Structure formats: C-alpha cells, structure tokens
Amino acid sequence: MVKNSFSSVISQEEKKENGGSVEFQVVSFTNKIRRLTSHLELHKKDYLSQRGLRKILGKRQRLLSYLSKKNKMRYKELINQLDIRESKTQ
C-alpha cells in the first residue's frame, strides 16, 4: 500500500494541537477516500466499502462547504494542496 504524504499540509505540531480542526479532518477523510478507492479498484463488488466511501465523501463535502462559508482563503488553499475539485454548488 502506498502512503500519501500529506504531512506537509499540516505539520506534526499542528496535528497534536488541532486534531479536530476542519483542515485536519478533511486531510484524514481524503486519505481514507484514496485508500478506499484503490481498494475498490481491486474488489469491485465490495458493496459495504462502496457505502462507506459514499458516507466519507458526504462528510468531507459538508466540512468543505462549512470551511468555504467561514474562510474562503483557507478553503482555496486546502483544495489546491490536496488536489481535489471544487464543489460546483459554491
């Protein structure tokens, strides 16, 4: 399994202090999404994992929506650093 190096996005000190921050949660959800996506490429009929992936995608989308309403600059930086698409509804 290939590990994604998103530690550059949030430093180790910030992880300890702000484990519940929106950015940290989005990064951890993105790691889970990428891991589940690679799993589902091998196991196409794993419907339980597909359901879990959809739930995590929804959670990440809600957090990104919240962040875009509260602080647009932090939202744009996070989107660019994680290389994920911006939502069409924003």
Swiss-Prot record:
<dbReference type="InterPro" id="IPR005290">
    <property type="entry name" value="Ribosomal_uS15_bac-type"/>
</dbReference>
<comment type="similarity">
    <text>Belongs to the universal ribosomal protein uS15 family.</text>
</comment>
<feature type="compositionally biased region" description="Polar residues">
    <location>
        <begin position="1"/>
        <end position="11"/>
    </location>
</feature>
<keyword id="KW-0689">Ribosomal protein</keyword>
<dbReference type="GO" id="GO:0005840">
    <property type="term" value="C:ribosome"/>
</dbReference>
<dbReference type="GO" id="GO:0006412">
    <property type="term" value="P:translation"/>
</dbReference>
<dbReference type="InterPro" id="IPR000589">
    <property type="entry name" value="Ribosomal_uS15"/>
</dbReference>
<dbReference type="Pfam" id="PF00312">
    <property type="entry name" value="Ribosomal_S15"/>
</dbReference>
<feature type="region of interest" description="Disordered">
    <location>
        <begin position="1"/>
        <end position="20"/>
    </location>
</feature>
<dbReference type="GO" id="GO:0009507">
    <property type="term" value="C:chloroplast"/>
</dbReference>
<protein>
    <recommendedName>
        <fullName>Small ribosomal subunit protein uS15c</fullName>
    </recommendedName>
</protein>
<keyword id="KW-0934">Plastid</keyword>
<dbReference type="GO" id="GO:0003735">
    <property type="term" value="F:structural constituent of ribosome"/>
</dbReference>
<keyword id="KW-0150">Chloroplast</keyword>
<dbReference type="GO" id="GO:1990904">
    <property type="term" value="C:ribonucleoprotein complex"/>
</dbReference>
<keyword id="KW-0687">Ribonucleoprotein</keyword>
<dbReference type="InterPro" id="IPR009068">
    <property type="entry name" value="uS15_NS1_RNA-bd_sf"/>
</dbReference>
<comment type="subunit">
    <text>Part of the 30S ribosomal subunit.</text>
</comment>
